[in-house]
Each structure stands twice: as structure tokens, then as C-alpha cells.
Amino acid sequence: MLTDREVISTLDMLRNEHLDVRTVTLGISLFDCASDNFDRFATRVQDKISRYAEHLVATCDEVGEKYGIPVVNKRISISPMAVVGAPFGPDDMVRAAQVLDKAACNAGVDFLGGFTALVEKGMTKGDRALIDALPEALATTGRVCSSVNVGSSRSGINMDAVALMGDTIVQIAGRTADRDGIGCAKLVVFTNIPQDVPFMAGAYLGTGEPDVVINVGVSGPGVVKKAIDRAMQSGDRSLGDIAEVIKRTAFKVTRVGEIIGREVAERLGVPFGVADLSLAPAPQVGDSVGEIFQSVGLASIGVPGSTAVLAMLNDAVKKGGAFASSHVGGLSGAFIPVSEDLNIAEAAATGRLTLEKLEAMTSVCSVGLDMVAIPGDTPAATIAAIIADEMAIGMINNKTTAVRIIPVPGKKAGDTVSFGGLLGESAIMPVPGSGGSEKFIRLGGRMPAPIHSLKN
């Protein structure tokens, strides 16, 4: 039985605290669309996506209106294109991306993820073709997102793939230089990538997933901040008390997301997959993960104590969300994307949040270095080395880590770049020691998996 206070609290979340469902993502398997004839493949892909996604946007809007809770983004994820399009070379992979972009546009969704390669132990012909196609594919499409998994705790890190991704990111930035390298904002490099992520740009549908499935990503950093503020005003509070407040709030936010996701799935006649518990910020006041750090007594995100606060936040979100849903998946934690969070972007601009501190914080957060803008002249080997560092954190700690980094052509440290929309804007962050990693990266090979990978 809900108390009057809980009902009023939920209404406040909707009216004043930016509570929303950040994304409902429809996963569609394309394995049955595979063909060595490109035209046949393209027709099958368009037909299947159209068949299942035709009513996705309208259904999300109807369900959101019914409950008074907006579904901000409607998205599609597909099977890894490097596998589905294994017979194709780079040119046909570019064409495949354009087919997917058209299908996403026809369905009315914001983004389509799954232009993906899984290369943690090595690269097939299809994997290499997809990666080689990325600069042109991401430059000539608007809604296609890509991810490349280069490591895992069981397999180690494919350093040849890491080096290749450093080169590829530089090429993508150059190919989209007229748009401040925005193509790089649609590419994520992972270690331990989950198979059911609803958030972009890392979403794809894994090989063990259903033919079609709904996954939902909740939001709510503003809700968490307001709950902490109320708790701090009511008397002396310890960090244990604050963690309890976060946990209870995450429960409410997750339950809302699951209700929306399950009803959308039921109306579309497809199974419900998972709720991703991640606190996903937006570039507006009151919807910031960074503001939570100030609510618990820090001057800003990035100052000493930030990693500890993030660890507590991440853990409390998982505990509360797991109690609210029997099917939790995806990334599930707290995102700290620099340009997508006004408060974090401000901390980066003032120098309180550095690249090194950001990397330290990724060891305890949901993902990794996210939406980080760096100088356009940063060498490819340095970018690869940044990726390698982040992948090592994920491999050793048996967690998902990722890098979405944007070398902005023509910009230097301290300049400002605006990507627009949910991608926000940010100062260009300096890269200490840039140019000092060339020999290390060119060694290549596979970095062995840690000893704790031997679990059988």
C-alpha cells in the first residue's frame, strides 16, 4: 500500500525533478537476413526492421501519455553487423550502414545501434571490413551507432585492435571535421560489452538474445539529487543514511521504467528483456549526475573524494534497482559523460575535473571515458593508449569499461565545442603526455587475461 507521502513524492519526481524513461530500445535479430548477395540482404533487413519497429514510436508515446511519464528516446539495436554482414567488404559495409540509417529514419527512431564488431581475441574478415568502413559509414549516416569490443576479462585485450581503433577514431574525426568530429560521438570502444545495452552508442543485440525484445533504460539523476537535498536538510546524516536514500530513490525510478517497458512490450507483442538501471544525465540544469556530488558536500565533481562518492552512488543505484526489477541488465550504474552533463562539463572547463581523475572514477562507475573532447592534433597512438588504459581497468576489475572520445579537428585544449541536443557541449580537455606512447602501442599482440579469468 502506497502512503500519501510516497504518492506526493512520485508526483514531484514527474513535475519538478525531470523523471523520465531515457530510452525504450527494440532489439531485432538480423541473423536470418544474412546473404552473400547485398541487394537481397538489404531488402531483408529493411523488411524485418519495418515489420517490428513500425509501431514502436507511437506505442511509446501512447504508453508515456497514459502514465504521464515521457519516453525521451525510442531506439533500435541489431545483431552485430560484422557477423551478419560477414561476406561483405568495406564498401558494402558502408552501404549496409546506409540501409540501416534509412530503416531507422523510416521507423522514426532516434538512433540504431549494432554496427558492431567483437574482436577481443582476433579479427575476422567481416570485423576488419566493418572497422575499415567506420569513417565513411559514420560520416554519411545520421542515426547509426557503432561499438567495437576489444577486450574481456576472459580473453585479455586485443592490442592490435586497440591500435587500429586509435587510427580509426582519428580518421572519423577528420571525415566529420566540418561537424567538429561528431562521427566519433557515435562510436564506443568496449571491454566486457554487455549484450543487452539499451543506451547508445553501445547498444547491440547479442547472440544469446531473443529474435525481438524490448530493453528499457531509466534515468533520474535529478530525482536522486533532490532526494539527497531533502535528506540533508532534515538533520545530521551519515553517508550510510545517504546511501539508503539513493537506494530507495533508485527503486522508485527503476519500477517506473519497468512498468513502461513491460507495457510497451505487451502492446507490441514482443518479450520484455531488461531494465538498465543507469543514471543517465542530460545537458540541462536539474538533470545532472555531477550535481549529486555537490549535494553530498563536495565543491565539484573531480575534487578529492569524487571517486568515493561515485562508488557509493553506483552501488546504491544497483541495490535499489535490483530490488525493483527481476530482470536487470545493460550497464546499470551511473554515467559520467562529460559533454552530456552540464555540471561535469563545467568542472572540466574549470580544470577541477582532469582526464586522469576521470579515468580513476571510471574504475567504480557504470562505463568509462564518455563524451570526452580532446585536442584535434592528438596522435592516434595516444588515443589508442588512452583506450588501452581504460580497457585494462575493465579487464582486471571484471567490469564493463568503454571509451567514447572525440579529437575535435582544429580545436586545442581550453576551446569549447558544441555537439547539440543530448550530446551537449564541453571544453576541450588537455591530454598530458600526448605523443609519448607510440612505441608501446606499436608492439601490438594480445595482452593476456588476468589470472582470475581461470574460473572453471
UniProtKB/Swiss-Prot annotation:
This is UPF0210 protein Dde_3704. NCBIfam families: PRK05313.1 (NF003700). Homodimer. It holds the Pfam family DUF711. SUPFAM superfamilies: PFL-like glycyl radical enzymes (SSF51998). Belongs to the UPF0210 family. The lineage of its organism: Bacteria, Pseudomonadati, Thermodesulfobacteriota, Desulfovibrionia, Desulfovibrionales. It comes from Oleidesulfovibrio alaskensis (strain ATCC BAA-1058 / DSM 17464 / G20) (Desulfovibrio alaskensis).
